[in-house]
């Protein structure tokens, strides 16, 4: 029998209601959300999230931002934005997938008017999957080259080197080269002239490199065979891709701290500069890094959550995963700056000269560092294996999230046995064709357009803002907490609702506005400025996702029937699945005693017909 406290809760379930919490949904026909495949073990979900969210940005972006923005002081805005911005949306996306039992698009049946959020996320994650794999392609190329002795980037005695080349670790001022030619290290020339075969600009695309084509093909094939059977197999692969990087990071840290100059590097990394707290850019960098590293706004966390058991404690999972993500970023900084400190001492320069972020750290700074160490091949192989594992974990789950959304939309009457394998192959083939443009001589310029615009902080912040609006304001923050109370067995902290309703949207919109106001045209290496049409392509990529939300809202409202109020009401009425009906009907029987002339049986019919 329900308690008196439960009977006094009109309209929805109270947190005190426990009876329906463990009630399982009725048998559901195949294809319905209730028959959805789930993780073999809950640890598969945890490791998949770690493999996806803990990626290259934790290793090559966070340490540099921490150093640039006041060292240890940067952790203050970073943690504040994480608590009030990153973690609430991280939890929102995972819990939404688990509650709706659907991927990034159908999960927004909770507020159908905002289903454009799902399409926006899928556009972003498709672009991200397409260009992100180039980093893995370059890493695999470097990995193969790392078995050479001597390392090919350590000397100037190669066919791709010019007269302006000087060897890594040497003093450029002692080398003789034409006075009109700028000096370039052997590391830079290997990267630009051997790997990228860099052309003069975006208008000079050039030829496709056959070596990178082989690396790209091999990488995509590895991705395909790891995810083609779904989470039952990919959930096992991520045990390797998610854990192996930590083993290598520990090995690199042990090696790094034994190098001369490592302490100075770590001091540079953590030394607080309290004056930085008053600079807006520090807070903006902290917020942008949180949204990047937590993989928010891509719809993939929603897809991963949809494979959870319905009553899994995703609230606890969200906090654990957020902690692991941020702790990994901090730990990676110790590794990176211990080695950068060694480089600075060896070359007799300030650490600001060698400090890099992004591809510059992975393919220039670190390869240069290993040339200064004994047994450089060993450290090069370990480093690039780590990059591959970090990148593959993110790539597996990113493609999985996109494929999940497509399969959720696929009409059941057109399903066949190998549907998933075919869809995965089609998605990868399409991405591969686009990637071919990025392994040409002008491919780096195309890669940067995708990186700067398609999955930038602007698009992610825009998506995250509307996610909060759709759940907290349209569906209702209290209403969603009631649903979570049924799903989890306890009510999440009320602060989460206030974050979704007020704090997180303000954080998102504040950083979004700052990005637009302080927009700077895209350049390559601070020397090449993109033509106007290159920027136009970039903004088209950004708007392709951002316009999904307002376009679908306006289209849905304009195509509906009845008054504007009636259209709004209909389009904001959730579309429930069978497991929701079991839960909602249990709540209706407890909280809404039959009154008036309408019988209980009639209420059930009305309820089902409306939904």
From Swiss-Prot:
UniProt main location, coarse: membrane
TM spans (from-to): 45-65, 72-92, 123-143, 208-228, 247-267, 282-302, 319-339, 372-392, 422-442, 457-477, 498-518, 538-558
Membrane topology summary: Multi-pass membrane protein
Subcellular location: Membrane
Keyword Transmembrane applies: yes
A cellular component term, taken from the record's GO annotations: plasma membrane
InterPro entries: Na/ntran_symport, SNS_sf
Alphabetical UniProt keywords: Glycoprotein, Ion transport, Membrane, Sodium, Sodium transport, Symport, Transmembrane, Transmembrane helix, Transport
CDD domains named in the record: SLC6sbd_CT1
Cytoplasmic-side positions: 93-122, 229-246, 303-318, 393-421, 478-497, 559-611
Keyword Hydrolase among record annotations: no
Extracellular side: 66-71, 144-207, 268-281, 340-371, 443-456, 519-537
Glycosylation sites: 157, 171, 525
GO molecular function, one term: gamma-aminobutyric acid:sodium:chloride symporter activity
Family, as annotated: Belongs to the sodium:neurotransmitter symporter (SNF) (TC 2.A.22) family.
Protein function: Required for the uptake of creatine.
Protein name, UniProt field: Creatine transporter
Source species: Torpedo marmorata (Marbled electric ray)
Native organism taxonomy: Eukaryota, Metazoa, Chordata, Craniata, Vertebrata
């Amino acid at each position: 029998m329900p308690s008196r406290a439960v009977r006094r809760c009109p309209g929805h379930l109270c947190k005190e209601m426990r009876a329906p919490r463990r009630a399982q949904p009725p048998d559901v026909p195949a294809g319905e959300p209730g028959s959805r495949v789930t993780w073999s073990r809950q640890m598969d979900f945890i490791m998949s999230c770690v493999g996806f969210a803990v990626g290259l940005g934790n290793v090559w972006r966070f340490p540099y931002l921490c150093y640039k923005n006041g060292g240890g002081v940067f952790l203050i805005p970073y943690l504040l934005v994480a608590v009030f911005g990153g973690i609430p949306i991280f939890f929102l996306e995972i819990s939404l997938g688990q509650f709706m039992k659907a991927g990034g698009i159908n999960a927004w049946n909770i507020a159908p008017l905002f289903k454009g959020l799902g399409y926006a996320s899928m556009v972003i994650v498709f672009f991200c999957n397409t260009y992100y794999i180039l980093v893995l392609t370059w890493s695999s190329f470097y990995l193969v080259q790392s078995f050479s002795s001597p390392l090919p980037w350590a000397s100037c005695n190669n066919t791709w080197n010019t007269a302006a080349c000087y060897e890594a670790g040497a003093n450029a001022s002692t080398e003789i080269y034409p006075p009109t030619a700028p000096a370039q290290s052997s590391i830079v020339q290997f990267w630009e002239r051997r790997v990228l075969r860099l052309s003069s600009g975006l208008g000079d695309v050039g030829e496709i490199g056959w070596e990178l084509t082989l690396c790209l093909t091999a990488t995509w094939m590895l991705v395909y065979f790891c995810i083609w059977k779904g989470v039952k197999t990919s959930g096992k692969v991520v045990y390797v891709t998610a854990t192996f990087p930590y083993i290598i990071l520990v090995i690199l840290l042990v090696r790094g701290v034994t190098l001369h100059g490592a302490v100075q590097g770590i001091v540079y990394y953590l030394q607080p500069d309290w004056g930085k707290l008053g600079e807006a850019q520090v807070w903006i960098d902290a917020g942008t890094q949180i949204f990047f590293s937590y993989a928010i706004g891509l719809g993939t966390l929603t897809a991963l959550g949809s494979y959870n058991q319905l009553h899994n404690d995703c609230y606890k999972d969200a906090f654990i995963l957020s902690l692991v993500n941020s702790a990994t970023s901090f730990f990676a900084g110790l590794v990176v700056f211990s080695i950068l400190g060694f480089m600075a001492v060896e070359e007799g320069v300030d650490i600001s000269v060698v400090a890099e972020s992004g591809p510059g750290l992975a393919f220039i700074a670190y390869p240069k560092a290993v040339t200064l160490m004994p047994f450089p091949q060993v450290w090069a192989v370990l480093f690039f294996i780590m990059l591959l594992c970090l990148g593959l974990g993110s790539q597996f789950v990113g493609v999985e999230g996109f494929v999940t959304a497509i399969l959720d939309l696929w009409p059941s009457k057109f399903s066949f046995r190998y549907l998933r394998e075919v869809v995965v192959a089609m998605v990868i083939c399409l991405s591969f064709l686009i990637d071919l443009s990025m392994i040409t001589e002008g491919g780096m310029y195309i890669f940067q357009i995708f990186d700067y615009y398609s999955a930038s902080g602007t698009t992610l912040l825009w998506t995250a803002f509307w996610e909060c609006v759709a759940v907290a304001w349209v569906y209702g923050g209290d209403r969603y907490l009631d649903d979570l109370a049924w799903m989890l067995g306890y009510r999440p902290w009320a602060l989460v609702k206030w974050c979704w309703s007020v704090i997180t949207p303000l954080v998102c919109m504040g950083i979004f506005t700052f990005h637009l106001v302080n927009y700077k045209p895209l350049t390559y290496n601070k020397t090449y400025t993109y033509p106007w049409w290159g920027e136009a392509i970039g903004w088209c990529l950004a708007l392709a996702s951002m316009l999904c939300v307002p376009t679908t809202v306006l289209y849905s409202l304009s195509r509906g029937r009845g008054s504007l109020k009636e259209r709004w009401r209909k389009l904001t009425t959730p579309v429930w699945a069978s497991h929701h009906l079991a839960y909602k009907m249990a709540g209706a029987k407890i909280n809404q005693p039959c009154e008036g002339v309408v019988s209980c049986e009639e209420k059930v019919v009305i309820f089902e017909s409306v939904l």
